[in-house]
Amino acid sequence: MYAIIQAGGAGTRLKTISGDLPKVMVEICGKPILEWQIESLKKSGIHDFLVIISKNGKPISDYCGDGKKFGVNISYIVEESPLGTAGGLYFAQDIIKDDFVLCFGDLMLDVDWTRFHHFHKEKGAALTAFAHPNSHPFDSDLLVANEEEKIIKIDSKNNVRDYYYQNLTNAGLYICSKEVLDFVASPTKIDFEKVVLKHFIEEGKAYAYRSSEYVKDCGTPDRFYSVENDLKNGIIHGKSLANPQKCIFLDRDGTINKYNGLVTKPDELELMDDTSSAIKKINASKYLAICITNQPVIARGDVTLEELKNIHNKMETLLGKEGAYLDGLYFCPHHPDKGFEGEVPEFKIECDCRKPRIGLLKKAEARYNIDLNKSWFIGDTDRDIQTGINAGCRTIFLDTTPNPPIRFKDAKPDFVCHSLSEAVNLILNSERDNHD
């Protein structure tokens, strides 16, 4: 598989750091951004590269040459005049005959490309966008995807958002089929997102690959220094799903949001006072933050799947406004007890995903390459504790809910805490102590 790297940017926002160098040549910890990208792609077996450069891109071709010093093959497309983020793809049509990676040159990243490509093939997509939550969704363009992860539309950051939304942003990284190259019919100035991505969304052929991996734009001085710090601390490479991940699994009701009985509409969901600050600490650590929740309101017929999605969108919106996000959210819609008025028969079943069974954790384990034995489960009921025990996680019981029912009397947590912040601090401090 080929990788195309868009390296034509002048890096004007980075001039105080880069001087006159193209931005892909700015060094982070001794290597240009472009070299870090090539190394990440090479680890997944990608050895053929097309680098799109401007007529001022000689420093790039001088440094990289034919790629042999990196153990890869590099060819160049030189744009005599700027062709936007997609126009240069026209010149790749006779070279690339199959799927390819498209990567923009100001991204610092480390991705398991094999896993990404498998998702693309499994979906039968023409175009798959790498998508992830971020700490500022309120001023970001968002991808709106359905349950099959097909992209329905782009929610522009310029929209007046008087609604709740899922925190899912486009990272500027794609796997594309040859069909994408064929769509670029002439070497004219074309915007990839506004024209190419939009077309394949309308055709129903674009998908969102949600990942927790590190992909960040380092095109401004503040972002550059933040990325440099993350690289020094091992966060960038550690987040690659080629490596086993550690996770803090979180129950929802009574852990993330205040316990108010069964939540059947967005107005009834209210975050705990310390939720956002606690989850922000997880986001800044080497742990993932994933919510695991039983939602029998679906089986009871109290809410539809679409209504539950809007409840969860409210949760993500509130977290995002405070700079926090969940890497993933898994819910069980089932309940085994039958024979009640208004129930939905298809969800009134025995399943493997209703806590304390661990089907949801196994889904997260497979998607995010999670090492359950190095992970934690935090919740406010003995059902949560039993779930963590069943999965091989360490557990923390939150005594945030008055008089919780006792269903699993033998479920003994490793620790008891009075708030989510206390629990997260305990985990992260123990992590630091183990490394001292």
Predicted regions span which residues?
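Catalytic-core segments of class I nucleotidyltransferases/pyrophosphorylases
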Residues: F100-V101, M108, T114-K121, N134-P137, ...
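Acidic, Mg2+-coordinating phosphoryl-transfer loop and its flanking beta/alpha structural elements
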Residues: W376-F415
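N-terminal nucleotide-binding beta1-loop-alpha1 segment
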Residues: M1-G19, N243-D253
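A short, conserved acidic/glycine-rich loop-to-beta-strand motif
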Residues: K123-P133
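Substrate-recognition element of Asp-dependent hydrolases with the DxDx(T/V) motif
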Residues: I52, T275, I279-M315, Y325-G339, ...
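Conserved Lys-Pro-Asp/Glu-containing loop-to-beta segment of HAD-superfamily phosphomonoesterases
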Residues: V101, V344-E346, D352-I385
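Conserved N-terminal catalytic core of the sugar/cofactor nucleotidyltransferase
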Residues: Y2-I5, E27, K31-G105, W113-R115
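Active-site neighborhood of HAD-like aspartate-dependent phosphohydrolases
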Residues: Q245-A289
